[in-house]
Amino acid sequence: MAESLAHIKYVERMAKYAETIPQNFVPSVMSADLPSYGQRTPKVINGYYPDLYYYDLHCVIIGEAKTTYDIENEHTQAQLDSYIREIRTYNCDKHIIICSSIIAFAQITNMVIRKKQRELIRDITFHVLDNHLRHKVI
């Protein structure tokens, strides 16, 4: 389960936002690390449990909530690298959502832009969200 109230809010924000990504959203195929879902996401990716996972034949979404102090460190980079490798095995639209505080929004946005440029990632759409209404599609 989610470790803090802030983390829960970030996962709730991602879940609501994720519903807008697929053309024909199917609620029953989304799992999230929220009390209302009853358990953590069943999908394990290289030892990591994403906070949100959605897959239908046309779209896959992996979501990760990050607290302000858990952004640019080795653990987060390893998680993100694992999610990128995993999502590339799907033959459909690929999306990764990262949600954090309004304070960390610019830092995460810049981290994702640098990663996409450095690693030439063109087949995955990233969505950076803050805990309010701001989002950026990269």
Whereabouts are the PLM-identified features?
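Active-site metal-binding core of divalent-cation-utilizing nuclease and nuclease-like domains
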Residues: 2-3, 24-58
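Charged, structured surface patches that assemble and position nucleic-acid processing machinery
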Residues: 112-138
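Structural motif
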Residues: 31, 66-67, 98-102
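Well-ordered, non-membrane alpha-helical segments in soluble/globular domains
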Residues: 9-12, 74-83, 107-113
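Nucleic-acid nuclease catalytic cores
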Residues: 84-118
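Nuclease catalytic cores
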Residues: 1-15
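Conserved catalytic cores of phosphodiester-cleaving nucleases, focusing on short active-site segments
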Residues: 52-72, 83
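Mg2+/Mn2+-dependent nuclease catalytic core
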Residues: 68-92
